Amino acid sequence: ISQDSVANHCKITNSVILDFNKSQRNETDLWVLFKGRHNELDHCYIAGKSNRGPTVRIDLAGNNSIKNYHKITNNYFGPRPPKGGPSAETIQLGNSFTSMAPSYTLVANNFFDHCNGEVEIISSKTNFNEFRNNVFYKSEGSLVTRHGNYCIIDGNVFIGDENSEQIGGIRLIGTGHWVTNNYF
């Protein structure tokens, strides 16, 4: 298996990834990395990541990974302790170098429970993504359109905690986003 390989039309479903950390907290690791097109992560239980690096990352390097139409749906993302600083998102879509690339990734019907890795629970750095009907429960951070444009953020629920001042919501950067029917 090469780091340059891509996967198309693959699915990770009904799986558990729990406390699968490297021994050194500052070593970067990724629990789920998407490259290619039309891949899915659904009905999984993912919790306990404490290392540097996003839990799930969508990689758009190369023409074979843009317009990817990936789906991240119906998952439980469990507690992630604060890392301190960046590079601890629960979900990262793209990066600064691919911020103008179209992704068309759907993130829907997920439960984010105490996802406190950093200030961005979801970091969207690509175009044309949809975030629908997710629940963010006592998670210290926000859904952020960090780079990129034309995202739909609809029907999400953000449940805070009066004991934390770090609870976020939605932070918009870019053009053409539609934000509708969200509850805070």
Features from the language model and the residues they span:
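Blade-loop segments of beta-propeller domains
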Residues: 1-3
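Active-site beta-loop-alpha junctions enriched in small/polar residues
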Residues: 61, 94-96, 127, 148
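Long, acidic/serine-threonine-rich intrinsically disordered regions with weak helical/coil propensity
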Residues: 29, 42-45, 49, 53-59
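Active-site cleft segment of glycoside hydrolase catalytic domains centered on the general acid/base Glu
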Residues: 32, 58-64, 94
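Right-handed parallel beta-helix
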Residues: 6-21, 37-50, 66-82, 101-118, ...
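Structural detector of coil-to-beta-strand junctions
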Residues: 23-24, 29-31, 52-55, 90, ...
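Glycine-rich phosphate-binding "P-loop"
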Residues: 89-100, 116-120
